[in-house]
Amino acid sequence: MAAKIISGINIAKQIKQNIAQKIAQYIVNGYRRPGLAVILVGADPASQVYVNSKRKSCAEIGIESKYYDLPATITEVELLSIIQRLNSDEMIDGILVQLPLPEHINPIHITEAISSDKDVDGFHPYNVGRLCQKIPTLRSCTSYGVMKLLESTHIDLSGLHAVIVGASNIVGRPMAMELLLAGCTVTITHSRTKNLVDHLSSADIVIVGIGHPNFVKGEWLKQGAIVIDVGINRDTYSKKLVGDVDFLTAEAKASFITPVPGGVGPMTVAMLMQNTLQAYEHHLQAV
């Protein structure tokens, strides 16, 4: 029996509708709109697509977005100066710097410069540390979105074995903390992991984010596993967007699976909107 498809598009749509309703109520009550600063450095086509998607979502749900389209030649000092001004701007609740950055700019310096209460990407060490201590505030958008996808299956995650393929700071590491918080037994695998298939064959939940098209095969999976594909790649031959999981073979083995596109991607944007609302509400309470 083929797996049930977890539609990130549908779930993200509902989340954004809920956010829009809350924002509309704040406006009726006389409050300002939430403000999100979006910074793009350089002209990377993929980054431009991602930024446009985020700004479109802001417009749809009532968040005021302030866009900074900066040249790739901007210095790190100049970028840090812009961030410091935004940190002090009371009309800005969230600051997003689209990655990747040019090689001469250290992304760690940029992430750490953003005020932790405006870090709507959830990358600041303070927010990562809060998640590790089981008291999350602003959470990493992709892993937060994956948890919402898992919740939609209505399966009790406590005690399940989750295997993460990929140990990046953006996906793998925060994903592990989220799953631990949900009571899972977590295994993180990466490029140096031996016997990857042995790990995957015992996994109740498989989450893959490594940037290799169609890497994980269905025959590697446990029957009935929940498969979440975070990858998004352009297939060399078909030119279509594909994930890190070989969808056709995995669909035959899994109980639930996310498609690419239309799975994790929309959820990442939706949780960015959720984080912006959360930061906005925090700032309103602090006034």
UniProtKB/Swiss-Prot annotation:
Pfam families: THF_DHG_CYH, THF_DHG_CYH_C. It comes from Haemophilus ducreyi (strain 35000HP / ATCC 700724). One of its GO terms (biological process) is L-histidine biosynthetic process. The gene is folD. This is Bifunctional protein FolD. Its EC number is 1.5.1.5, 3.5.4.9. GO terms for molecular function: methenyltetrahydrofolate cyclohydrolase activity; methylenetetrahydrofolate dehydrogenase (NADP+) activity. Catalyzes the oxidation of 5,10-methylenetetrahydrofolate to 5,10-methenyltetrahydrofolate and then the hydrolysis of 5,10-methenyltetrahydrofolate to 10-formyltetrahydrofolate. Gene3D superfamilies: Leucine Dehydrogenase, chain A, domain 1, NAD(P)-binding Rossmann-like Domain. Belongs to the tetrahydrofolate dehydrogenase/cyclohydrolase family. It catalyses: (6R)-5,10-methylene-5,6,7,8-tetrahydrofolate + NADP(+) = (6R)-5,10-methenyltetrahydrofolate + NADPH; (6R)-5,10-methenyltetrahydrofolate + H2O = (6R)-10-formyltetrahydrofolate + H(+). InterPro entries: Aminoacid_DH-like_N_sf, NAD(P)-bd_dom_sf, THF_DH/CycHdrlase, THF_DH/CycHdrlase_cat_dom, THF_DH/CycHdrlase_CS, THF_DH/CycHdrlase_NAD-bd_dom. NADP(+) binds at G166, A167, S168, S191, I232.
